[in-house]
Amino acid sequence: MFRGSTQLNLDSKGRLAIPAKYRNELFANCGGNIVVTADPSRCLLIYPQPVWEPIEKKLSGFSSFNPQIRSLQRLIIGNACDVEMDGSGRILISAPLRQFAGLQKEVVLAGQGEKFELWDMAKWDLEIDTATACKDGDIPPELEGFSL
């Protein structure tokens, strides 16, 4: 289970050092085999390969005759990259994915349960500002009655 956010730096080659607290779990659960893909929010999604596979299968199974579904398939599956964590716990983020998400040197790795989101730090700050600006009436019906 991945939770919390960590401020990190991409190195000059576009590699991301996965925080030590997650490395053992990733090596144990997926042998360090990871999938990185684009998200419509202009961040990147990072999945352990076994978590990604049923998502890809389900998304691929939807009809591509629906233009919205086809666009999502192109974005998410079409940009998916298999990467392997090296012995130092680093993964290479491809140049096209870095460009898509606007990643500069300073990034935020945000745990989201079974996956991570990778954000440019400035975009992450804006995302958090937007989330904290929500009014009580803005809560989706699915969360009504949910208490923290």
Swiss-Prot record:
Gene3D superfamilies: Transcriptional regulator MraZ domain (3.40.1550.20). Its main location: cytoplasm. The keyword Glycosyltransferase does not apply. It is found in: Cytoplasm, Nucleoid. Signal peptide: none annotated. Residues 5-51, 80-123 form the SpoVT-AbrB domain. Keywords: Cytoplasm, DNA-binding, Repeat, Transcription, Transcription regulation. GO terms for cellular component: cytoplasm; nucleoid. Belongs to the MraZ family. Forms oligomers. This is Transcriptional regulator MraZ. It comes from Nitrosomonas eutropha (strain DSM 101675 / C91 / Nm57). The gene is mraZ.
